[in-house]
Amino acid sequence: MGSPFKDHHHHHHPFSLAKKLIPWTFYAMIPLVLFRLYFYPYPLHNITTPILTSSSSSVSSSTPFVAEETSCDYTTGKWVRDKRGPLYNGSACGTIKEGQNCIAHGRPDMGYLYWRWKPKHCKLPRFEPNTFLQLLRNKHLAFVGDSMARNQLESLLCMLSSASAPNLVYRDGDDNKFRRWYFESHNINISVYWSPFLVKGVEKSNTGPNHNQLYLDHVDERWAADMNGIDMIVLSIGHWFLHPAVYYEGDQVLGCHYCPGLNHTEIGFYDVLRKAIKTTLKALIDRKGANSNGINAFVTTFSPAHFEGDWDKLGACPKTKPYKEGDKALEGMDADMRQIEVEEVEAAKMNSTQLEKFRLEALDVTSLSLMRPDGHPGPYMHPFPFANGVTERVQNDCVHWCLPGPIDTWNEILLEVIKKWDYESRREE
């Protein structure tokens, strides 16, 4: 399957878009929760506005900022109070998925909006939308992955909208899983591609098998077919690997995860996640590493959920403040998923040291996100869930992030890495 964007043309070029087994008792309900949370749909429409020009021009020499020469470890730090509040008004941003618009859905507490991440050994500046737009001028930025990729994308669109209005020029697929916005002011395209495994996959459905099918040695061409027209890419996967699945490699069944009734070897999902990331990064290196315009790539690390008990229990994620430093340790599945992603990024960087136009970084947000149990929609994934009184059972989203919310910090770090890369490029000129 090729790109869903294949019929939308561009002026310059076409966009052809076990470890050991984990305990079943601990994760038995997580796939069901995630499946329910990922599918509360948008209305479906096709927008026929043409995609406008984008090229891979270098950043203007008049970029209005001074980048830091030294790198910063953003992974260690603490959340501190910030009287300035959020970077944008959720009610005024039109790109937020309804389930993450917590204030509009009646969330009564506002304290979660007044925190900022403070790294231990360096500074994280407040997001500056004009700087981001200037750095991405004439480029195509793509977010590829599951609904956490979409969550991060929608955060970024809101953060940029105060400086330049994004124009939705394309949408397609169930739940509008493939969309593109155009920023006319800076000739920027920003897209989102639904690809919950990054590799080729067949998702479970009500009419087909009750498990996913992953082909670990084939990248998902729904996004990879567009690779030549992408200048910067943010990859984000993890949660969909918890679902029941059968895995294929070399067209042979490799094993499965939670597949009772099928005559396949249970291998869990840790090694499978590693293979999927390895295949994806190899495809980027092979197709773009020596390409004339190259690519800048990020892997956003695993985002922890914060369920306390059953997903449909009142108070499933009841916290209203961040954890304090030392209150919560990164461990278990959250730590293992992050470690795999970071290790594969480092391995790919080692394999691409001779490629001048391929840059890769882990956007390591797992620890700082773990400290924000207060940042999820919870019951406010639906509008005014207690309008008719409080009930013992209510659906909760303790996976995705409210907008505005902690996920905005991910994009602040994203900008700082882009600034660092630009600084390094200028030194090499």
Swiss-Prot record:
Q: Which gene encodes it?
A: XGOAT1
DXXH motif, short sequence motif: residues: 397-400
What protein name applies here?
Answer: Xyloglucan O-acetyltransferase 1
Q: Name one GO cellular component term.
A: Golgi apparatus
Provide this UniProt record's keywords sorted from A to Z: Disulfide bond, Glycoprotein, Golgi apparatus, Membrane, Signal-anchor, Transferase, Transmembrane, Transmembrane helix
Its main localization is: Golgi
Q: Does the keyword Transmembrane apply?
A: yes
A GO term for molecular function = xylan O-acetyltransferase activity
User: Its biological function?
Assistant: Xyloglucan acetyltransferase that catalyzes the acetylation of fucosylated Gal residues on xyloglucan side chains. Predominantly catalyze 6-O-monoacetylation of Gal residues in the Fuc-Gal-Xyl trisaccharide side chains of xyloglucan oligomers.
Highest taxon listed in the record's lineage:
Eukaryota
Report the EC code(s) recorded for this entry: 2.3.1.-
The biological processes this protein is annotated with in GO are:
xylan acetylation
Q: Please list the residues that make up the active site.
A: S147, D397, H400
- Give TM regions: 21-41
Q: Which InterPro entries match?
A: TBL, TBL_C, TBL_N
Lumenal compartment segments? 42-429
The compartments listed are: Golgi apparatus membrane
**Lineage, highest ranks first:** Eukaryota, Viridiplantae, Streptophyta, Embryophyta, Tracheophyta
Answer whether the UniProt record assigns the keyword Glycoprotein to this protein: yes
